[in-house]
Amino acid sequence: MNPLIIKLGGVLLDSEEALERLFSALVDYRESHQRPLVIVHGGGCVVDELMKGLNLPVKKKNGLRVTPADQIDIITGALAGTANKTLLSWAKKHHIASVGLYLGDGDSVKVTQLDEELGHVGLAQPGSPKLINTLLEGGFLPVVSSIGVTEEGQLMNVNADQAATALAATLGADLILLSDVSGILDGKGQRIAEMTAAKAEQLISQGIITDGMIVKVNAALDAARTLGRPVDIASWRHAEQLPALFNGTPIGTRILA
């Protein structure tokens, strides 16, 4: 069975209750299914807390974090360090053998600079599946941060949704984007069960889909097109539904290619 990539985001990394729910669901799923799992994560809340503590400004452009040269080391420490190791510690607590990685390990995801105005922000492209497939064959849970590196050795902060998409293309994996919200909402706050590119363009033009959700929807649409299959956006809040989600039952918004 092809792997499943679970991309974690939102305040999940900042909530012990949420992490307990997630890893309990992962344990239940792994006990009843042989499907290999990979976690990809960002950690915007961890970065924001650190930046605030250091009195550094947080600037975003089109939903992407601007990352100046003097901040990339801090952001790398927050994402590839604190956020990654927090997830590894929760895996350890739940007796899941895990390995912490960043996008550059094994050239799993290739990264180039996205836009000079954004600074150290990377564009992710599929890379080599060899390392992660080896880990999956050994029964490990790879936990991959959204920090990448260019061919020139420059560290880059990559949008985690886009990083997960590139890794899914690398591995031929299915993709779930877990976030704080139950899916994409319409103008009345109701969950939209299925989303096409045309529907997304309409909601963006109407101002219903805004800011970071535009990035998330575009990443999911890109993933669906790249992978040739649907991608799910769903919430981590309903732990009892997560095993069904991991098994292919939509509980949020299903993005169609």
Curated annotation (Swiss-Prot):
Q: Which cysteines are joined by disulfide bonds?
A: none
Cite the InterPro entries for this sequence: AceGlu_kinase-like_sf (IPR036393), AcgluKinase_fam (IPR004662), ArgB (IPR037528), Asp/Glu/Uridylate_kinase (IPR001048), NAGK-NC (IPR041731)
Specify whether Transport is a keyword of the entry: no
Primary enzyme class: transferase
What Pfam families is this protein classified in? AA_kinase (PF00696)
Q: How does it assemble?
A: Homodimer.
Please state what the protein is called. Acetylglutamate kinase
Instruction: Report the source organism.
Output: Enterobacter sp. (strain 638)
Q: What is the gene called?
A: argB
